[in-house]
Amino acid sequence: YQNAQKKHKNNIILSRYAGPGSHRYPLGFSGDSVISWASLDFQPYFTSTASNIGYTWWSHDIGGHMQGYKDAELSLRWLQFGVFSPINRLHSSKSEFTSKEPWHFDAVIEQSMIDFLQLRHQLIPYLYSANLITASEGRALVEPLYYEYPMEEEAYQHRNQYLLGEQLMVAPITEKMNSLLQMGSVEVWFPEGTWYDFFNGQPYDGKVSLKVYREITEMPVFAKAGAIIPLDKNPLKKEEITSERKYFLEPMVSIFY
């Protein structure tokens, strides 16, 4: 870290967990994860609870790193979760069966991956603001529900559900879809108040747990009534990116009320 500081102003160090205090310098990651649904199901809990020891900039190998088998649905669900994680990092061992780039999948999966990656770009203003709060105030970027609702039993029971920044509640789908319904599902606890689907604005009453169903190209993310989400209005498309073009943001805001 000190050597990197001498050469460059902004640096990234990626490291495994190395004991208490090791969160101060690097981005952490959860190790070489196996490509499986069981592994994905563990990652949201692992990511949010890393904040318990100060490791708020925590990442995971999106899609899994090794072993397992090629599973397009698993890869897309993991990428969706990655878009709403502190660090969005596709990674795998060198193999034609484990590659996670969108162009390695069929048209439906590829386009959905592209849409979610462009959404990640749109979220930069929101994530940047949340990261500033993390850096200046020490508030975790990702929090287990019990940080905000410590007296609610449900906050401890829904281990894969978490808060991203101050405005978004995320509930990744981590199980295979129902073959009959052709939808994935996850049980979501809605704390007190009114919550809105981040993508379509559908309202949900609070103080209730519901099984929420989503098609393979959709993901459960919610904003509480009154939330203001700053977004980039026009994320760059791949054909617009050139070595000469400077990176820019054109802001917009989503308001949930």
Residue ranges and their predicted role:
Residues 218-257:
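Accessory, solvent-exposed terminal regions and/or long lumenal/extracellular loops of proteins
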